[in-house]
Amino acid sequence: MSKLFQARFATTVNDTHYLPATPLREVAFAGRSNAGKSSAINVLCNQKRLAFASKTPGRTQHINYFGLFAKDDLLAYLVDLPGYGYAAVNHETKYHWNTLLSDYLQEREQLVGVVLIVDSRRGITDLDEQMIEWFVPTGKPTHVLLSKCDKLNKSECKHTLEAVRKQLQQYDPALPDGNGESKQLTAQLFSSTKRIGLEEADNTVIKWLFEAETNEDEITN
């Protein structure tokens, strides 16, 4: 059973000053409104309504924290970031969201990686690129879930995955010529509806959150 199955709602904040004062590791989920972010969190945690999934874009307007527990011991956090790119909000709200996201991504020390949900039918948009550009300088990894891949045929899936991986290479400072396989920015196909790519995504998140713990166990043994 995945450790993600033990997720429970912890807290919600609308200002980085009120983020949990804890040394525990965090993995954040980000993405455009209606890209399937909440659905991805729910299916990975094997829960129907842990993160609120709505057909109305822009419903996630705060930073929502979900704690991962072993019995009553809090081990780590999953973080649901506000969806971006929703047009029907005023300028002041958009500015607040942008500031909230950029400050969190660039300054949160406990954040060990970002899962970026991208609609496979749209590919990486300008706003997705902005998220990547904010986070890449931290040196921490980004893993792209190409959501709703069940809407594409096999050929389209292959082409989309190859194109996105090549696009991500351009942002990796370890690949100055934009060629080669990026270790910091990775991508996979994913579908919450058809449960495609769950194991790969789960393994990535678990590795980020508990890698140090695993390494310590190996050294001890």
From Swiss-Prot:
Keyword hit for tRNA processing? no
Q: What's the protein name? A: Probable GTP-binding protein EngB
GO CC terms: cytosol
* GN (gene name): engB
Q: Which residues form the EngB-type G domain?
A: 23-211
Biological process according to GO: division septum assembly
Q: State its cofactor.
A: Mg(2+)
> Which InterPro entries does this entry report, sorted A to Z?
G_ENGB_dom (IPR030393), GTP-bd (IPR006073), GTP-bd_ribosome_bio_YsxC (IPR019987), P-loop_NTPase (IPR027417)
Q: What is the organism of origin for this protein?
A: Polynucleobacter necessarius subsp. necessarius (strain STIR1)
